[in-house]
From Swiss-Prot:
GO terms for molecular function: tRNA (guanine(37)-N1)-methyltransferase activity. GO terms for biological process: tRNA N1-guanine methylation. Keywords: Cytoplasm, Methyltransferase, S-adenosyl-L-methionine, Transferase, tRNA processing. One of its GO terms (cellular component) is cytosol. It comes from Leifsonia xyli subsp. xyli (strain CTCB07). The keyword Cell membrane does not apply. This is tRNA (guanine-N(1)-)-methyltransferase. Homodimer. Belongs to the RNA methyltransferase TrmD family. The gene is trmD. Its main location: cytoplasm. The keyword Methyltransferase applies. It catalyses: guanosine(37) in tRNA + S-adenosyl-L-methionine = N(1)-methylguanosine(37) in tRNA + S-adenosyl-L-homocysteine + H(+). It is found in: Cytoplasm.
Length: 227
């Protein structure tokens, strides 16, 4: 998969050089390009924002630098998906992460200030599939944190990135439920014992217990996930 990021803070994404995603880059499973939006400005202050038409608080990101940056990233690209993190977008879910993991090319546009000029979205939609995506019902200072979260959620679903594919099925949201509680050695710690069923060696009973715990946790914490 090819991933491109347009941002005014390119060093923010240096963390993608480490951990599983860093290894995925080293092995060629993920190719990453980070592009500084300010490289596409033409004034000595490298200005990327201006006051909003119609008045109002804050600044809006100018279409010019965005247009040039996206033109460069999308030139020659085959059927890319351009994602703009936005609290006004569709909610990001595990199902969307699985969908995006099947794409060949993702482009993330990290907005700041009061957002990006609407014409940038409209123009990009004439070259690519554009999606505004919300990480949750809250507002961040910019799109970088949301982009990082989405890249990690998507990247780990690419075949070969996570060592044991079975772990992707068993974790929270893998089957529409929250994950069951996990335990490791020692069998007793500070007077708290591991549930006996997990020590029984009875795989059928263990599977049933885990399913029961997943359903109970989902009912308690996220009842909206249940049918």
């Amino acid at each position: 998969m090819r991933i491109d990021i347009v941002t005014i803070f390119p060093t923010f994404f240096d963390v993608l050089d480490i951990s599983l995603l860093g290894k995925a880059r080293q092995t060629g499973r993920i190719a990453l390009g980070v592009h500084d939006l300010r490289d596409h400005t033409h004034d000595r202050h490298r200005t990327v924002d201006d006051t909003p038409y119609g008045g109002g608080a804050g600044m809006v990101m100018k279409p010019g630098p965005w247009g040039e940056a996206l033109d460069g990233v999308l030139d020659g690209a085959e059927d890319p998906v351009v994602i703009f993190p936005s609290p006004a977008g569709e909610p990001f879910t595990q199902a969307m992460a699985r969908e995006l993991a099947g794409e060949q090319h993702l482009v993330f546009g990290c907005g700041r200030y009061e957002g990006i000029d609407q014409r940038v979205f409209d123009d990009a939609a004439s070259h690519a599939r554009v999606r505004l995506v919300s990480l949750g019902d809250y507002v961040l200072n910019g799109g970088e944190v949301a982009t990082m979260a989405m890249i990690e959620a998507v990247g780990r679903l690419i075949p070969g990135v996570v060592g044991n594919p079975e772990s992707l099925v068993q974790e929270s949201h893998g089957d529409g439920l929250l994950e069951y509680p996990s335990y490791t050695k020692p069998a007793e710690w500070r007077g708290r014992a591991v549930p006996p069923v997990l020590l029984s060696g009875n795989h059928g009973a263990i599977a049933a217990w885990r399913r029961e715990q997943s359903v109970a946790r989902t009912e308690r914490v996220r009842p909206d996930l249940l049918p």
